[in-house]
Amino acid sequence: MYPILQFAQTICNDNLELKNFCQFNASGTNKNLEPTTTPASSLVSETAFKGSEETLPIIEAIKKNVCKANWRQTYSTSEVGEDFVNRHCYFELIGPTGHFYNDAIRGFICYWGENLHYKWHSHEAEEIYYILGGKALFKTKTMTKVLKANETQFHKSWESHAMETLEEPLLAFILWRGNGLEKLAQIDD
């Protein structure tokens, strides 16, 4: 998992929006989490993500380390449906319950399959999405825009937002900061 952590550090140092969002510190203690799988985790290594020059190194590191990650699900089938559960997964790279401990931020690697609707949801922690590969339509109550590799989207605390992947899967690096760091997102609709 160290290669992913190092590439995440580089991305946070090089991208102004991420750098301004938080101080990413790759020196957290390795918690040696047990690898776990979800129905979608094998799809990550099988997908040819459309990345950018900046994101291709971390994409390759993630794909090479799929079997070492502690993949998780946030929602139940009753909340988001079976298709979503089967085609979405994430692991916490850095944070209170991540592969590398940090109590000031959380950093997730998240995957969504193509043509997938991520319902309106919110959380107390502030958040910034950084797209590694693929593209998706992001929505808040005041904006709608398509993001692709090397682009970001910020969400304020408790700002309800939704996302739809398009004709290709999405891989994203997501950072959280502030209050509510220990909690997960909740479905709003």
Model-derived features: positions:
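A short, N-terminal "cap"/entry segment at the start of jelly-roll beta-barrel domains
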Residues: M1-D103
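A generic structural signal for short beta-strands and their flanking turns/coil linkers
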Residues: R87-C89, R106-F108, E127
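Short beta-turn/strand-loop junction motif enriched in small, turn-promoting residues
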Residues: P96-G98, L116-H117, S160
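Short histidine-centered beta-strand/loop micro-motifs
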Residues: Y101-N102, Y118-H123, E164
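Short, conserved beta-strand element in jelly-roll/cupin
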Residues: I109-N115, S122-F138
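Short acidic-glycine-tyrosine-enriched beta hairpin
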Residues: K141-S160
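Ligand-binding loop in jelly-roll beta-barrel domains
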Residues: S157-G180
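Short peripheral tails and domain-boundary helices/loops at the edges of structured domains
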Residues: G178-D189
